Amino acid sequence: MRIFHLITHFDLGGAERVAANIAMSKTPDMEYHIVEIMRGKSLYTNKFITEMKQAGVVCHRSLMPDVNFHFVFQRIAAILFPLRMLYIMLRWHPDVIHVHTETPDMCIYAFSRFFPFLLRRTRIVRTIHNTRLWSGLPSIASLIEPYYIRHNANIGISDSVCQSYKQRFGADAPIIHNGVSVIKQQIYPRLVHS
């Protein structure tokens, strides 16, 4: 099975880390790819790509620069993404597309409007990572949320995320507590006990 994780950029972030941890899992018969929507350019980007490649995850870099100046650039990326995704679909034929955060959500929604027939055999999964979706963008939310609800694609990462989603959009999302690797707590030698 071929699974594609779509993230905003190859950079440091909670959703990016969850996608990376899932993609790096050594699940038998699973081929993982990770696709960035906007090109990451931080000091962490190269480390992220190296980590993915060492784990056998195929990385698909974006040509669209990540400009943090205004949300309009994410909208442009979403409009242009269907052409890039067309190539990915025709070349790789993913069985599952797993989106993380609003920018990838917009991109797959846009792709589904242009090329719905290419998604007929592909399962869409969407992880909701936070309690506030589409802050300041209610018109975009009113277009995109019904798509993910209709496709039964939503998965929340916590009770609070799922409760917030149900309160705002009226739909239930199952909870899956995965994608976060367990880290052993280190003892801090200078801790003062009182």
Segments predicted by a language model, with ranges:
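Short His-centered aromatic/hydrophobic patch
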Residues: V99-Y109, I128
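Carbohydrate-associated surface elements
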Residues: S160, G179
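A conserved, positively charged/aromatic
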Residues: F73, M89, L118-I155, Q163-F169
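Short beta-strand scaffold positions
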Residues: H98-V99, G156-I157
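A short helix/loop element that forms part of the nucleotide-sugar donor recognition site in Leloir-type
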Residues: K47-T50, Q185-S194
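Proline-aspartate-enriched helix->loop->beta-strand connector
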Residues: M89, H93-D95
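N-terminal strand-loop element at the rim of the active site
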Residues: H5-R75, K166
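Structural motif
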Residues: R2, D95-V96
